[in-house]
């Protein structure tokens, strides 16, 4: 099917950026079967790029990462007249994402699988495949983020997408420079409504496809609880105050997260918040809000994206959850501990918040920003 003309200014601007892109216009597009990646492919084709579709097969069964996504991605490639390839990543996904996720919940942290998946399952392997198997110099995806090339000391800088409601830079902080330098994000300056309008104008079969509202593993199993129940048997334990006073019971610490207030099943004189998950004692530790705040946290395995590693404290805006509002904090370098010396990213920092924070969750990412630019990020550590 021929690609139609665009109707939005944002779509026209995206096409012009693609036409003016420096270097070779040859790319592998990561196709999930959703509207965002579908429109990305359509824009690249319309801009005159040589495009090949690539879908990563992550899980067996139904869902966006499985049969449904594969079928829709293949249909989009047929509609646009481009090749479609499928790479079986199920074993890697099971080892790198599923098992690590289960281990993290078992150990009392709340992992962030999406950033790890982007680094070790999606972008890295996708670029390797494009370069080695198809001799394609670039990869593209439908993420709402932007890249500025030739920034500080020649680095490839990651920027927020212009649509603040859809910005996905938080999940991309962990990508290395060698990958960022070869990525194309055509939707970085579009809004989601722009994307829907452009997809409809192009007559894409996915134009009205609803978005996934949860982690792909949760969608796959029906809910996050069902996913965890499939891997972790119930383990009854106590819900306690910080002084050890028992106030309730639970059937698994994996069903709780630091900062949680609702769904505790505890009757108390005032609302209680989860402040710690004690895996060794199989306890959920709770406290009133007045005792639940944190003024600092340690961030480990830091990946410096748009700047070199800092050597002195600096003020940043930091986001500690995907949907959280960025807050101001002082970012200070810490010496690497012995356990981190042999790691790929041994950098550690301390974040000191200007105002007390209430959902500082071990295992989640803390991503550092300077305005719209991602400086770097890492994983919140237990202390």
Curated annotation (Swiss-Prot):
Cellular-component GO terms for this entry: cytoplasm
Keywords linked to the UniProt accession: ATP-binding, Cytoplasm, Disulfide bond, Nucleotide-binding, RNA-binding, Transferase, tRNA processing, tRNA-binding
CDD domains: MnmA_TRMU-like
Listed name of the protein: tRNA-specific 2-thiouridylase MnmA
Alphabetized Pfam families for the sequence: tRNA_Me_trans (PF03054), tRNA_Me_trans_C (PF20258), tRNA_Me_trans_M (PF20259)
SS bonds (residue pairs): 117-216
Family under the similarity heading: Belongs to the MnmA/TRMU family.
Origin species: Synechococcus sp. (strain CC9605)
Broadest EC class assigned to this enzyme: transferase
Annotated site location: Interaction with tRNA: 143, 364
Catalytic activity: S-sulfanyl-L-cysteinyl-[protein] + uridine(34) in tRNA + AH2 + ATP = 2-thiouridine(34) in tRNA + L-cysteinyl-[protein] + A + AMP + diphosphate + H(+)
Binding site for ATP: 30-37, 56, 142
Catalytic activity, EC: 2.8.1.13
HAMAP family, A to Z: tRNA_thiouridyl_MnmA
Chain spans, region Interaction with tRNA: 166-168, 321-322
Lineage: Bacteria, Bacillati, Cyanobacteriota, Cyanophyceae, Synechococcales
Active site: residue positions: 117, 216
BP-aspect Gene Ontology terms: tRNA wobble position uridine thiolation
